[in-house]
Structures are given as structure tokens and as C-alpha cells.
Amino acid sequence: MDFQSRILGHFNASIDAKTYASEVLPPFIEVASQMMVQCLVSEGKILACGNGGSAGDSQHFSSELLNRFERERPSLPALALTTDTSTLTSIANDYSYNEIFSKQIRALGQPGDILLAISTSGNSANVVQAIQAAHDRDMHIVALTGRDGGDMASLLGQDDCEIRVPSTSTARIQEVHLLAIHCLCDLIDQQLFGSTE
């Protein structure tokens, strides 16, 4: 097997996925960034959740806001709901794994806050329940999905925003999700603190 050819194939597939996504996703990323900025200037916060690689993306996003992205600026309020193992395991043990995010949202979410809900399939049951809990708390949703949007897409209202990656490959969807997250962080900084160019 020619491993270098296989590696090149992955690079090319990633480039193709991002090129295709660049033709359809920018308007949705722009709207999502504007929603997040409105939340932040209104003294709200952004909660984020997902499973596996999407949990990592949730933490990546919140760390970029709490710390910094590519320039010095004040910390911004964001929280990944994926990091507190005592909370996650107690909810999973006492209730259900499907409730590990929704119970946190019911305690922490406030009207006007945003939930960044991440799932490559759009069908993660605990993320679906997180969206339902966020709506119950009068929060808005920014959903990062893939494939056909899954169950998450059907739960979104007119005040929510879905960034759906046009791919069926989990790896390619995750790669575009990370790029979308970086775009969101950049646009938040641009809108709140002005251009650096």
C-alpha cells in the first residue's frame, strides 16, 4: 500500500469538502456570529456541547472565547458543558446519559443565552435534549451539523441557526466544523473589537 498516496487522498478530500462548504456556509456562519455577538453585548453567555470529537470542538470554542483567539482582548463568557466529569457521571448514573447536557442547561441557561450544539450526524440524543432544554429556557441555538441535519434540524426555530456541512464523511464534517468555529471566533472579535487590518 502506498501510504503517501493515501495521505494525499485525505488532504484532497478535506480540500474538496472545504471548497464545497465555502460555497454554501458563509451566510449561515455570518448569521451565527451576529447572534453570538448580540448575546454577548446583552451580557449573555454561550454554552456549548457535543460528544467525542464534537465535545473537543465545544471545549476548543469555549477556550478561544474565554482566553483569546488571535489577538489580545477581554475574556468572553463561554462554557463547555462537556468538562465536569463529576457532573456528567452523576447525571448519567442517576438519570440518563441523554440528560447530561439538558440538566446543566436548565440550571445555567438564561433567556437570551446561546447554545452551540455540535453533532456530525445531527442525531445525538443528548444534544437533541440539550436543544429542547435550551428552548425551554428561551435560549437561541447555533447548531453545527452534517449529513441531512438529523433530528436537530427539525427542532430549530426561526431564531436559531444551523451550519450544516454538506458531507456524509464524519472526518470531513469535523474538519469543516473546526474551520467554522475559527470563523465564528474571528467574526466575534471583528464585530466586538474592530478590524486589525
UniProtKB/Swiss-Prot annotation:
Its cofactor is Zn(2+). InterPro entries: GmhA/DiaA, Phosphoheptose_Isoase, SIS_dom, SIS_dom_sf, SIS_GmhA/DiaA_subfam. One of its GO terms (molecular function) is D-sedoheptulose 7-phosphate isomerase activity. It comes from Chromohalobacter salexigens (strain ATCC BAA-138 / DSM 3043 / CIP 106854 / NCIMB 13768 / 1H11). It catalyses: 2 D-sedoheptulose 7-phosphate = D-glycero-alpha-D-manno-heptose 7-phosphate + D-glycero-beta-D-manno-heptose 7-phosphate. This is Phosphoheptose isomerase. The lineage of its organism: Bacteria, Pseudomonadati, Pseudomonadota, Gammaproteobacteria, Oceanospirillales. Catalyzes the isomerization of sedoheptulose 7-phosphate in D-glycero-D-manno-heptose 7-phosphate. Homotetramer. The reaction produces a racemic mixture of D-glycero-alpha-D-manno-heptose 7-phosphate and D-glycero-beta-D-manno-heptose 7-phosphate. Zn(2+) binds at residues 60, 64, 174, 182. PROSITE patterns: SIS. Binds 1 zinc ion per subunit. Substrate binds at residues 51-53, 64, 93-94, 119-121, 124, 174. HAMAP family: GmhA. Its main location: cytoplasm.
